[in-house]
């Protein structure tokens, strides 16, 4: 952004400004969520529910890589926006350059660890005897693409902070379209099974990352030189804490999913559904939930540059206006999503293949119980991100850690002891209710501070 374009963040009507930035961000993240949905749909019809169960085992490992990427990208995005608000262009350039370097290094390290410890990792995340071969095959090819994936996901929010949310959206969209085209070809024409689904996903990630590289060569406000790509401790310390909430949100989700998968296998094995049906079904339900959360995060993260600029420029009344407009929109999203989950669960699960009556029975129960507190979940997630945008990583990360680790993990372990397999399903709404109380208190305190 140039100075005049930056000024728009501090003067334009909030409603229009929020839509302008949030819509492309939302579409970008929604497209990212569709990567997994598309894989699940084609694998469900081409391989069967064991194939879907295998991808559900691998999914948390992709989320872990995403967590590292968004810690770098979202942190840099928040910091760059604040720097623009303060007129500190040099620090903004150095933050972006170091984020590029760090994302590449992190991606390579994660891929190496995944490759070396593949078998124990899959066992840790709930692979069963029936789906292990599928999981190993899928994970092998996903691992190859991890460095590209981390880089592409880290660059996307940085592109938004440079005033190009539309390009950020298009780069994600291009990768998703490629994935959608290649998936059926790889699975149904070439008969590559889960390997084909993984290869199509990686191909889409390559396209997204390549577009990110092209953008870095033609940035708007950022002027990157070779010196900016050095890793400087002072710059890293300035922006990585701002992305800590995003990282903890993802890493906490990974921990929760690992615990959930293992509880599903343990208590499912003693139920009429067996171990593999609950593991597969809840994984699919979580992918659908990720669509809702992607919209939630997109609406909130799209506002980060606006909040960051106005907070840096000390226009606190505008920050407060964004706060309550955002929370209202997120609550409405949650209500609409809840109605869909309650009214059309069978139609939703049918998208992922034709399975037995027992499978469908558990799917309907899971949609209706596990996601029954969606309006609270969307507001909670928005609260985490808003505090991050204000440059308050402690409150942001604290709420996220409280929800995903201190609540979700103990609940998913303890509730099944009293309610069996259903206890696993009760754990999510219970965690959302308690977190909503904490989020409300934090937001009210932020509102009071913004009034001063």
Give the predicted meaning of each segment:
Residues 52-112, 149-168, 279-345, 378-399:
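Small-residue-rich hydrophobic transmembrane alpha-helices
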Residues 1-22, 80-147, 189-244, 307-373, ...:
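Short alpha-helical transmembrane segments in multi-pass integral membrane proteins
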Residues 9-46, 60-75, 79, 104-111, ...:
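N-terminal transmembrane alpha-helices
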Residues 34-52, 122-129, 185-192, 254-284, ...:
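Helix-terminus/linker motif at the lipid-water interface of multi-pass membrane proteins
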Residues 20-39, 141, 152, 175, ...:
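Transmembrane helical elements of multi-pass membrane transporters/channels
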Residues 47-60, 135, 139, 198, ...:
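Small-residue hotspots at the loop-to-helix junctions and early N-terminal turns
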Residues 64, 179-183, 209-213, 291, ...:
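Hydrophobic transmembrane alpha-helices of multi-pass small-molecule transporters
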Residues 73, 142-160, 168-179, 197-210, ...:
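Short runs within selected transmembrane alpha-helices of multi-pass transporters and secretion channels
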